Amino acid sequence: MKKYILIIFALFSFSATNAEIRWKLSEDGTLTISGTDMPDYTAKIENGKVCVSAPWYSQKNKIKKIVIEDGVTSIGDWAFPECKNLTSITIPNSVTSIGDMAFSDCSGLTSITIPNSVTSIGEGAFAGCI
């Protein structure tokens, strides 16, 4: 019985932690990112589809809002591509850089404020967002 409860919990809890970043996707579609320095992620083509190494990528169609909490200092390469239902992003003053292709093809994006603390925006960071 205990094993089944753990399996069910794992299936319904879309959150994870690594040494630098913690994330949680709530039922309302808000992806909250906390921690410090976000790593760069990679993208590759598998069976004709783009696959991204960001841990929340498999949930990309559920993401409607991204809240990056204070303390996160960078947004990594390929962090949030193809989040078609994403409409708003909150970036704190602690962020100084946005990586390559970070928000590419987020075609539903309507609201983002980039703070003055951001001194570097990578190539294609917002490609396909309009």
Describe these PLM feature segments.
Residues 20-30:
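The feature captures the LRR N-terminal capping module
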Residues 4-13:
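Sec-dependent N-terminal signal peptides
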Residues 40-59:
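Acidic/polar low-complexity surface segments
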Residues 28-38, 61-74, 84-97, 107-120, ...:
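Structural signature of tandem-repeat unit edges
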Residues 76-79, 99-102, 122-125:
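Consensus positions within tandem repeat domains that build extended binding/scaffold surfaces
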Residues 15-19:
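Sec/Tat signal peptide C-region and signal peptidase I cleavage site
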